[in-house]
Amino acid sequence: MENVGTEISTVSREEVLPVLATAKIARPRAAALAARPARPRPARRRFPARTLHLVDIENLAGAAIPSPGQVSEVQGRYVTSPGFGADDLVVMAASHLGLLNVALGWPHARYRVRSGPDGADLELLDVLWHEDVAARFTHVVIGSGDGVFGQAAANLSERGVRVTVVSRRDSLATSLARVAMDVVYLDTSQAAAA
């Protein structure tokens, strides 16, 4: 057999790409989609809009071991200040000595326990640093006035999370107030823009 008229030639990639780019390929679905008016798409989030409340009850109550009555009083003020939604998550932190009082005074929360200096703060920071809060929540309320939360709050703000601080007026660190979008004082129940 004789190979009549068959000649193999090499074509470079640079020669093929312009031809492919201008070639019209029949794509009925693509044409239908292109003809449809463009709608603005909301940013896709993996989780629905939710709020995380991180509560250092010892700081808000102003006591190392708050009584159930003090915890209930703080809860009453706190719940009316930033407002709660049905899907909000409350994480409370306290020492092992105050855990029972906290659970009795503010039921239906997730409790974290650590004793020692700044134990409650460290537990709440552990939640912020290790639980991908920015991907799961659109709003974080920090129930503490301790400045140790300043860096974590700034990181959340940079990632598009709204940060609110709930604190007693006399225990709010300036560094934390600066990075928060909103500040709510429990003792006066007035919000001040930070």
Segments from the language model and where they lie:
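Domain-level signal for Mg2+-assisted phosphodiester chemistry and nucleotide/NA-binding surfaces
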Residues: 2-120, 162
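Nuclease catalytic cores that cleave nucleic-acid phosphodiester bonds
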Residues: 96-194
